[in-house]
Amino acid sequence: MVEYDKAHGGKIVSSMFAKDNNSAVYDIREFNTGTPITNLIQEIGGEILSGNEDILERPIYGYTIVDSLKAITTFNVFGDLYGWSNERAIFFSGVHYGRSPMIAIRAHPVKPRVVIYVKPKTIDKLATKLAEMERIVLVKTEFDEEEIVTVLKKFN
């Protein structure tokens, strides 16, 4: 049953490990197989803000979409964003400048491969600098959360 659930996105198993403080998580899902970061960026109409060629071709194995303001105020364990693997994309919505998510990621020992800002107001230079320092691909998209989920379901 666990393997079947995992093969279909892992929602049931993920919900078994869910915490009361995960109201910030809009969606979390694992992919059946790895997908190159470039494919994901193309599918969500993303614009790369930071990241070099060798990182862009690496695979990711899932994603998490999170409300950045709720995450800052409700998460006790930042690692709850990672699901089965940190080789994933973390989407942050409600981003104004992009500093807070990148500072939180920098402070945590486990890093995602990709950070994607959903409809950010603007991106501060500090956010891109932190992404470069941590070797994280930083992307922005104008897709909303529903559009992102619809597109990413194709990867399963």
Enumerate the predicted regions with their spans:
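Short hydrophobic alpha-helical runs that function as membrane-insertion/retention elements
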Residues: 90-91, 114-118, 136-142
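Short, structured coil segments at secondary-structure junctions
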Residues: 8, 110-111, 132-135
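Short glycine-/small-residue-rich flexible loop motifs, especially phosphate/cofactor-binding loops
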Residues: 38, 104, 128
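Short, glycine/polar-rich helix-capping loops at beta-to-alpha or helix-loop-helix junctions
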Residues: 122-129
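Amphipathic coiled-coil/heptad-repeat helices and related helical stalk/stem segments
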Residues: 99-101, 124
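Non-catalytic interface/targeting segments
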Residues: 2-98, 141, 146-156
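Mid-chain, well-packed structural core segment of small domains
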Residues: 104-116
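Short alpha-helix boundary/capping motifs
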Residues: 97, 120-121
